[in-house]
Structures are given as C-alpha cells and as structure tokens.
Regions:
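C-terminal ends and interior cores of transmembrane alpha-helices
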Residues: 85-103, 350-372
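Intracellular juxtamembrane helix-capping segments at the cytosolic ends
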Residues: 115-130, 392-406
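Short amphipathic helix-loop junctions that connect adjacent transmembrane helices
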Residues: 29-47, 287-312
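Conserved MFS/SLC helix-loop-helix module at the cytosolic interface between two early adjacent transmembrane helices
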Residues: 63-98
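Glycine-rich segments within core transmembrane alpha-helices of 12-TM secondary carriers
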Residues: 135-156, 162, 177-181, 218, ...
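Central cavity-lining transmembrane alpha-helices of secondary-active solute carriers
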Residues: 52-70, 315-328
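Intracellular loop-helix junctions on the cytosolic face of multi-pass helical membrane proteins
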Residues: 1-10, 131, 162-292, 297-302, ...
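Cytoplasmic membrane-interface "Motif A"-like loop-to-helix N-cap segments
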Residues: 72-84, 334-353
Length: 493
C-alpha cells in the first residue's frame, strides 16, 4: 500500500477507504434485499423481483443526476457528504418494523447511494491529468478492489442473518459505516477539492449560493419521486429505458458541438461501448434477483458437513475481485510495456465470452442435479469466479475510459451516463429473473426447468455480444485513438 501512496496523487489512498466503507451498507441491501422482502416481510418472489429491479435500475439512473449536480450545482465532495447522510438515514428508517416504511427507507437510501457514487468517481478522476493513463487505470482497479472489500464485509455479516431472517440488527451495524465514511471525508476534505468544474468558474457568491440551493432542493425532491416509482414498478422500468435513450441522444448532440473533431470521435466510441455494455450488465444483474433465489432454494449448500449461507456464497464475487483487480491491472500494464496493447473494445469482448461461460456452468449444474433437484455447489463457485473475472474486464476499465476520452466539461455527464445505462440493464434483467420464478414453489424439481431455460438464454446473449463487439472492435479502437482523423489529415496534406 505504501508503494501506491508514493506513486498516487494526494487524496487517492483515503478515497479507497471511503469507497470500502460507503459500499458496506449497499452490500447489505444488495445481498439481502430480496431475502428480506420475501422471508421477513412476506412478499411474493415476483413482487420482490420488481422492487429489487426498481432499486437497482434507479440506483444507476441517479448516477446520471449525480453527474449533473456534482461540479455544477454542488461541489462533488459536498454532494457526497449530503448523500452519505441520506444513505444512513434510509437504513435508519428500514430498522422501523412493518411494511409502511419500506418504500420510504429504500427511497432515502437510494437517493443517497445513487448520487454519491458518481461524485466519488469524479473526485477520483480529477486527481489525475488526462495523460496519466497508467496511474489512473491502476487507481480505478484498486478502487474497484476497495469497493469489493465493502461488498465482502457486507456479505459476510449478512450471512449470519440468513437463517434468522431478522435484519434490523444488521441494518443498525451498517449505519456505523456511514458515520465512518463521513469522518474520513471531513478529515481529508481539503484533498478532495474539485478541479476544472463549471461551479469553480462561478465567481459571484450570490450565483454560487443559488446554484447550491437548487442542488439541495432537487436532491430532496427525489425522495418522494422514488416512493412513487416503487409503487408503480412496471411504469418505472419504462421510464428508466426512455430516460437513458434520451440521454444517449443528448450526448451525441453535445459531441457534435465539440470544436475538436477528435473529441467527437471519442464520444462516438463512448456511445458504442455504452450501448453494448447494457447487454453485459443486463445479464450480470440477474444475480441479486433470480440467481440469489436459485442458490437459496435449488443448490446443495453443504461444504464439509456445514451448510453455507447464501450471502457467503455470493461473497466469492467480492473475493475474486479483491484479489484479481491488482493482478489484472499488473498484467495489462506488463502487456503494454511489451508492446501488446489490449484495446478497450477487446477487453469488452473477453468480458462477454467469459460471462457466457459463467452461465454455461449454471446450466451444467442444473443438468447434473441430484435426485432431489439440487445442483452441486461447485458449479455455483465456478459461475461466480468466471463472472467476477468478466466484471473486472469491463467495470473498472469503463470508469478509467471516461478519464481518457472525455472532454473536461463533459466528464461528469459521461461518467453519470456510463453508470446510468446499468439502470436500463437492471430494468431488463428483472424480466429474466421473473422468468426463473414463474411459480412460487420452492421445490427444485419443479423450478429447475425454468432456471435452465433462462441460463441457456443468457449464455447465448453473452456470446452474441462478444461476436458483435469483436467485429467492430477495430472501428472503436480507431475512434478512441483518433487514427482515422490522422490518416485523413495526411491525405489532405
């Protein structure tokens, strides 16, 4: 860690700790929400999938609004602080018993974590100059690992409550991590100042205060809007898709207005990779919905005579990423040093291929289920390991890509949009998850066919994504590297 501290700009290392602690409470809900809703509150599997789908979808849609607010109406560090408090307040509301406070608590929490994620990534991105590619890539891989330390801790703790189905005490513990996050942020406040943002250009005190007031009010208004969205989940999912489509068109328009043609070329590459990433995350986000229920009800979770909690099994993802992130970063940097330049688009191709393999493991597990319909735990472990490797080749790479190709004035919007399209994926993935649970039965013999059908479909879709990206990877690389423009200029000369 000291090596990283010497090489990285001031403030980067504290950001890793902020990432880990702020992720903890999200990990609690990410791993336990569907179980909390069905086991403790008594909702059906379909309603649970709808709620979790809205939760995931709007978490990512709010990333876009975080990109708009941060650096324009509120500084990224101030917005992060406010939303971190909201995140903790949402957990506090969920501690209250009964169904009536569920949507209010989830809405408070959702606005908090939805907005502050983009703030965090913007703060980290702004620690580097555009030409600091190697340092920036390494920082985002390590940040991704730190995030998964939070997931790992949340999953471990959640597992202790998997059988009791009493989650109030678990929620109390997660409030403490929000307080720790706030303390670290305040202690290193001066290290997280915005660089080259529109708000920094506002010199008049009155104009700045008006912007800040507008930012605070618009943040507060989001809470009742989220409550409405939870009550009308099907309409909400359609809204997510429409908003994302509009935003992609807006970015295309903004790209055409760029004075530098090279910036427009890079924005076109960004849009291509963003649209294809929707398919990847749509497949990936069946995890916290359908696959969690599959592991809970259709897998023999015994290991060495002990039954392992569902959340602990899901924790394999976090462990692989914590260990794998620095290793993958090191491998990519060594390949670059040897002249082997693995382009962003080709990393995406490998991500899709490995994701397809991960779902084939689940299908094989169902095909070789025992006489009672239970799949072997080994196939689940293989699925989670390969899925995690696929995530490493698209998650941190995408964040680092923004710092490389984005014009300074569009950095927050592009970062928010990149994260927002995951909301479209979550909206679509809940349909696959519902296809897995057409019946409320928990008997594996009854439900295995539904799961097998969907697993095969997801593997095929991932393979299609890999093939499509492979054939356009050269075009995308040229857009990012601006090779076509250089060739055109040479011909003109």
């Amino acid at each position: 860690m000291s090596y990283v501290s010497k090489k990285m700009p001031k403030g980067v290392t504290p950001l890793y700790f902020i990432q880990a602690f702020s992720t903890f409470s999200f990990a609690i809900l990410y791993s336990s929400l569907s179980l909390y809703i069905t086991q403790q509150l008594g909702f059906s599997n379909t309603i649970s999938n709808n709620i979790v789908g809205v939760f995931l979808a709007f978490n990512y849609v709010l990333h876009l609004w975080g990109g708009v607010l941060g650096g324009r109406y509120l500084s990224n560090r101030l917005l992060f602080f406010i939303t971190n408090i909201m995140q903790g307040a949402g957990i506090l509301v969920l501690i209250l018993p009964g169904h009536s406070m569920l949507y209010f608590g989830l809405s408070l929490f959702l606005v908090g974590c939805g907005l502050n994620t983009t703030c965090y990534n913007s703060i980290l991105t702004q620690r580097f100059k555009p030409e600091d590619e190697e340092q920036r890539d390494k920082a985002f891989f390590l940040s991704y690992a730190a995030m998964n330390v939070g997931f790992f801790s949340g999953y471990i703790l959640s597992g202790f409550y998997d059988y009791s189905n009493e989650y109030q005490e678990l929620f109390c513990i997660s409030i403490a991590t929000s307080l720790i996050t706030a303390f670290i942020l305040l202690f290193y406040w001066s290290c997280f100042e915005d660089n080259h943002t529109p708000l920094k250009a506002v010199t008049k005190s009155i104009s700045r205060k008006k912007r800040e007031l507008a930012g605070i009010v618009s943040t507060a208004v989001l809470v009742p809007l989220m409550i409405v969205c939870f009550h009308f989940s099907h309409l909400s999912n359609a809204v997510v898709v429409v908003l994302s489509s509009i935003m992609l068109l807006v970015i295309l328009f903004l790209g055409k207005r760029q004075k530098d043609k090279a910036d427009f070329q890079k924005i076109k590459a960004f849009l291509i990779l963003t649209i294809t990433s929707i398919l990847f995350w749509m497949i990936y986000y069946t995890g916290p919905m359908g696959i969690t229920l599959f592991i809970k009800n259709n897998v023999d979770k015994h290991f060495l005579g002990y039954e392992i909690a569902t959340q602990w099994i899901m924790n394999i993802n976090a462990v692989v990423i914590i260990i794998g992130a620095p290793i993958v970063s090191m491998i990519i940097n060594r390949l670059k040093a040897k002249g082997v330049n693995l382009s962003i688009s080709m990393q995406f191709v490998w991500a899709f291929l490995i994701l397809a393999v991960s779902f084939l493991f689940l299908s094989i597990g169902v095909e070789f289920a025992d006489s009672q319909g239970f799949s072997s735990l080994s196939w689940i472990i293989l699925h989670l390991i390969t899925q995690s490797v696929a995530e490493l080749l698209i998650g941190p790479v995408g964040y680092a890509m923004i710092g490389k190709i984005s014009p300074t004035n569009l950095q927050g919007i592009l970062m928010g949009t990149w994260m927002m399209v995951s909301g479209v994926s979550a909206s679509l993935s809940h349909y696959f998850s519902n296809a897995m649970v057409k019946t409320e039965a928990a008997d594996p013999i009854v439900t295995n066919n539904d799961f097998l059908h969907v697993f095969n479909q997801l593997a095929i879709w991932a393979l299609v994504g890999a093939i499509f990206l492979y054939f356009i990877s050269g075009r995308v690389k040229n857009l990012i590297d601006n090779e076509e423009e250089i060739k055109t200029e040479e011909i003109t000369v």
